[in-house]
Amino acid sequence: MKNIFKIAIVLTLAITIYSCSDSYYDTNTPSNAVAPESVAINNILPSAIQATMSAQYSAAVSLAQVDQHIASAFNDQNIDKHYQNSLDEYWRLVYSKALPNIKVLEDKATATNSSHYLAIAKVLKAINIGLTTDLHGDVPYIEATLAATNFYPKYDAQQIIYTDVIKLLDDAIVLFSTPNTSISTPGADDLIYS
């Protein structure tokens, strides 16, 4: 019995010492990861559009269940079931997928002087943040894409967000009306208008 106890103590100490190693954190760091800055602008746009449309679909399905838009007149209670797997899916898609992709698209468009890509980024941002504030009221907006440095963004007032959504759309109209002087022009990567 004493031997089993000693072996258990030695194993516990060995596991504890190994788990405290700093080299453990290098295990899950991908060696071939691509930095967002090195991705071509025409490869960022489809991701931003897809994340936006997924978020819109998630919001539509959630609201349609509440409003009974997807209900039918069947008498059987098991026939007409439409369930959302997660109630936070819209929020997750907007803040962890759509807005970060749009931020990268905005930065890349600004760096390459691609006015039409920048206009698309502004429209997508207005769509995402506009519907988010419609659904939830005051939401994180100004600090929303600073996740790498700020895990707790402050909530911005809905009126400020609506004012900025209108400004984003006005800016996009101006950018769309100006000639694109960049070599990067939206084409097949624009999943909506191509």
Feature locations, PLM:
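Solvent-exposed, flexible loop/coil residues
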Residues: 28-33, 143-145, 187
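A broad, low-specificity signal marking well-ordered, structured residues that form hydrophobic/aromatic
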Residues: 46, 139, 191
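Bacterial Sec-dependent N-terminal signal peptides
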Residues: 1-30
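Short, intrinsically disordered, charge-balanced linker/junction segments flanking boundaries
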Residues: 186-194
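A generic structural signal for short, solvent-exposed coil/turn residues
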Residues: 5, 9-12, 133-135, 185-187
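Conserved, well-structured interaction surfaces
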Residues: 73-184
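Membrane-proximal, proline-rich intrinsically disordered regions
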Residues: 20-85, 89, 93-96, 100, ...
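Residues at the start of alpha-helices and the adjacent loop-to-helix junctions
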Residues: 6, 12, 39-40, 113, ...
